[in-house]
Amino acid sequence: EIQAIRRDLHAHPELGYEEHRTAQIVADRLEAWGIPVVRGLGVTGVVGIIKNGTSERAIGLRADMDALPMQEINGFAHASTNAGKMHACGHDGHTAMLLGAAHYLAQHRNFDGTVYLIFQPAEEGGGGGERMIEDGLFERFPMDAVYGMHNWPGIAEGTFAVVDGPMMASSNEFRVTVRGKGAHAAQPHRGIDPIMVAVQIAQAWQTIISREKNPLLTAVLSITQIHAGSATNIIPDEAQLVGTVRTFTTEVLDLIERRMQEMADGIAAGFGATVDFGFKRKYPPLVNHTEQTAFAIEAMRAVVGPDAVNTNVEPTMGAEDFAFMLQAKPGCYVFLGNGDGDHRTGGHGLGPCQLHNASYDFNDNLLPIGASYWVRLAETSLPVA
């Protein structure tokens, strides 16, 4: 049944804050299993509530529901039927695993306390986790800790990976406009060339990473777009630098943002140009908490054995908006290995089975493993006296 749900969700992907069908399926299933449901938290989010015993302790288990704006090239039976939309990050599987756990917990209730089942919208850049928090997630559903999980291609099928402390990086965007003075390209002395100034700024910024930041603290500053000009014989009025900054600590991020602006302003002023400096902090670093990570490791080892749990995985510079929940509550986020793609049925797109790839598919062999982890985590965190 859970596999059928997963494949149905894969065939009907919905983008962030558009997960109406998905949320309806989730809520209907939970209610059919006798689980009270709150709908519409954070626009399309769903929270299920399973109580047992008399303890006031509570934990949250979170799964994301949204898809990506991509055209799937797989040709198997459960491929996307919605043009330009695809579950290329496995959120269909995340939703299904939490539903599987919900069904078991509702039937057996071998815990003392409350388990909140958090089905989150809009993880893919929409900030759905933050939106649910702003909509009262932790006030309306008070919990002691919150947990998340993500499938991870390249890690052996059915193995877990986690690290105490920083697990994923912050995600930040900058958009910096250099304003000069346009001129004929044959008479550059009559203008102020914003392209030349922008290039100087871009080169200087990289010294923040190589010469100003502590080399033991990881960070990335990538310029991914440069926009300027419209003709070969015109020096434009402005040039724009766009890109991303990733860090594992806010202290390093503070340094980078401050020095980027100082360098941009100073270099531009030296050439008679000006700068409009835009820097947006999107997702904070995802940092696991020690006590909850220990609970998670205990639960993972109980499900797959100690040899299949890597507790020293290398953090990734990718970002996750579950970080907002871990800022508000203690908790832990883990990776569950999706394998190398051998699980895909015939008719797949022949490309790599990587996240955000048009040939990706979630590994259904993970469904019982992920669901069992959620169950074990609930029973470990909320033991019956």
Ranges and model annotations:
Residues 1-87, 96-99, 103-111:
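Acidic/His- and Gly-rich active-site-bordering loop/insert found
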Residues 2-3, 20-27, 98, 195, ...:
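Hydrophobic face of alpha-helices
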Residues 9, 30, 48, 61, ...:
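Divalent metal-coordination and catalytic microenvironments
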Residues 12, 189-195, 251-257:
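Active-site pocket-shaping loop/turn-to-helix segments
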Residues 32, 199-385:
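Metal-dependent amide/peptide-bond hydrolase catalytic core
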Residues 46, 68-70, 74-86, 92-93, ...:
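Histidine/acidic-residue-rich, glycine-tolerant segments that coordinate divalent metal ions
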Residues 62, 71, 174, 334-338:
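Non-cysteine beta-strand/loop elements that form the S-adenosyl-L-methionine
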